[in-house]
UniProtKB/Swiss-Prot annotation:
The active site is at residues 151, 402. Residues 1-6 are intravirion. It comes from the Viruses. Catalyzes the removal of terminal sialic acid residues from viral and cellular glycoconjugates. Cleaves off the terminal sialic acids on the glycosylated HA during virus budding to facilitate virus release. Additionally helps virus spread through the circulation by further removing sialic acids from the cell surface. These cleavages prevent self-aggregation and ensure the efficient spread of the progeny virus from cell to cell. Otherwise, infection would be limited to one round of replication. GO terms for cellular component: host cell plasma membrane; membrane; virion membrane. Homotetramer. It comes from Influenza A virus (strain A/Chicken/Hong Kong/FY150/2001 H5N1 genotype D). N-glycosylated. It is an enzyme of class 3 (hydrolase). It is found in: Virion membrane; Host apical cell membrane. This is Neuraminidase. Glycans are attached at residues 50, 58, 63, 68, 88, 146, 235, 386.
């Protein structure tokens, strides 16, 4: 091969190699562009890890859950049809109470990011139960927890998390700005009621599916306040009770009927010498029963029951097994307010079964400690103090606090009756303990017609925390 042929051969080989290399580079560029386009499309739809998004489309809930696995966002989607929580069934027959949840929020909060809260309560849809709570805009064991014994501040918000979980920034959902609140589900969406503002002019903001739908202005300009537990829904309408006026004298009380977040009717109770605060309400056979707190002059609990047209009856639980705190020792009851130790009070609940009543109360007669459930077979109408069942929930040596009712509808449980349940707040910190903060955890129980056990399920946190020393 002469020199010219060698040059031509080498040139040809180089040209072939160059063309192959160019084709490989073009293929690589195309591959990168296609891969980038696919990733960009997925990222446009995805949200951060473990975040749930609910989209409402033509009366169908689309429940979307995003799970982050090795930096790849996978979207799973399940359509869930909405229902109407009828509330027409009767309360389930029960013989005792089975423990349902315990969040251990204070114990976990000594080392983890847990909200400073008070007034927790539970409410259930046809799909899930959630714990609602009023935060103080602060975390446990942090400087902003100082002074959180205060009830009403602009930093308080209503938030919620899955039942049984400690309330933290990582699992909680903002609901409303509020220092007094209620929430419930009608089978289609969550209704939240959050009261905030000055004592002499607070406003309740109603939200339905997270959107503001109505407001209620304080009508007596004296600390408008509501239940601190779930509202009650029947046949697509939800009902709540609000108070406006003195905490130690005659106040004004209204029942509100709400549909899809808008007030459609209200009635003011004609209730002289009655005092209603922080009512615990539940549906039973298509009507609503609320058992409340008398902070004026009763150591037994007032009640109001009403139908869907807001036609109501009022009274006091007659039993000599008194349900408020402070209270006298059990004795002879009254179907009106029992005056001894009647001033002040604590949020509580009871469940009516015919002439009988399940009474939840603190074990102590003068401090917020201990908790027990008592069945008085004649206590709704009879004034004696005889009872047939007592179930221990929290020992008298451990702190308790507010308590309230919630229910699980047949659409959730699959049984043909409404299951009665209750929660107990376990308050820790100020004013009884040497801390700079006040907060609480919670436990809950549901009624069953099978074996149960009495025990003590206390908060269990060891105080003080590092921030308190």
């Amino acid at each position: 091969m002469n020199p010219n042929q060698k040059i031509i051969t080498i040139g040809s080989i180089c040209m072939v190699i160059g063309i192959v290399s160019l084709m490989l580079q073009i293929g690589n560029i195309i591959s990168i562009w296609v891969s980038h386009s696919i990733q960009t499309g997925n990222q446009h739809q995805a949200e951060p890890c473990n975040q749930s998004i609910i989209t409402y489309e033509n009366n169908t809930w689309v429940n979307q859950t995003y799970v982050n696995i090795s930096n790849t966002n996978l979207l799973t989607e399940k359509a869930v049809a909405s229902v109407t929580l009828a509330g027409n069934s009767s309360l389930c027959p029960i013989s005792g109470w089975a423990v349902y949840s315990k969040d251990n929020g204070i114990r976990i909060g000594s080392k983890g990011d847990v909200f400073v809260i008070r007034e927790p309560f539970i409410s259930c849809s046809h799909l899930e139960c959630r714990t609602f709570f009023l935060t103080q805009g602060a975390l446990l064991n942090d400087k902003h927890s100082n002074g959180t014994v205060k009830d009403r501040s602009p930093y308080r918000t209503l938030m919620s998390c899955p039942v049984g979980e400690a309330p933290s920034p990582y699992n909680s959902r903002f609901e409303s700005v509020a220092w007094s609140a209620s929430a419930c589900h009608d089978g289609t969406s969550w209704l939240t009621i959050g009261i905030s503002g000055p004592d002499n002019g607070a406003v309740a903001v109603l939200k339905y599916n997270g959107i503001i739908t109505d407001t209620i202005k304080s009508w007596r300009n004296n600390i408008l306040r509501t239940q601190e537990s779930e509202c009650a829904c029947v046949n697509g309408s939800c009902f709540t009770v609000m108070t406006d006026g003195p905490s130690n004298g005659q106040a004004s009380y209204k029942i509100f009927k709400i549909e899809k977040g808008k007030v459609v009717k209200s009635v003011e109770l004609n209730a002289p010498n009655y005092h209603y605060e922080e009512c615990s309400c539940y549906p039973d056979a298509g009507e609503i029963t609320c058992v409340c707190r008398d902070n004026w002059h009763g150591s037994n609990r007032p009640w109001v029951s009403f139908n869907q047209n807001l036609e109501y009856q009022i009274g006091y639980i007659c039993s000599g097994v008194f349900g408020d705190n402070p209270r006298p020792n059990d004795g002879t009851g009254s179907c009106g307010p029992v005056s001894p130790n009647g001033a002040y009070g604590i949020k509580g609940f009871s469940f009516k079964y015919g002439n009988g009543v399940w009474i939840g109360r603190t074990k102590s007669t003068n401090s917020r400690s201990g908790f027990e459930m008592i069945w008085d077979p004649n206590g709704w109408t009879g004034t004696d103090s005889n009872f047939s069942v007592k179930q221990d929930i929290v020992a008298i040596t451990d702190w308790s606090g507010y308590s309230g009712s919630f229910v699980q509808h047949p659409e959730l449980t699959g049984v043909d009756c409404i299951r009665p349940c209750f929660w107990v707040e376990l308050i820790r910190g100020r004013p009884k303990e040497s801390t700079i903060w006040t907060s609480g955890s919670s436990i809950s129980f549901c009624g069953v017609n099978s074996d149960t056990v009495g025990w003590s399920w206390p908060d269990g946190a060891e105080l003080p925390f590092t921030i308190d020393k």
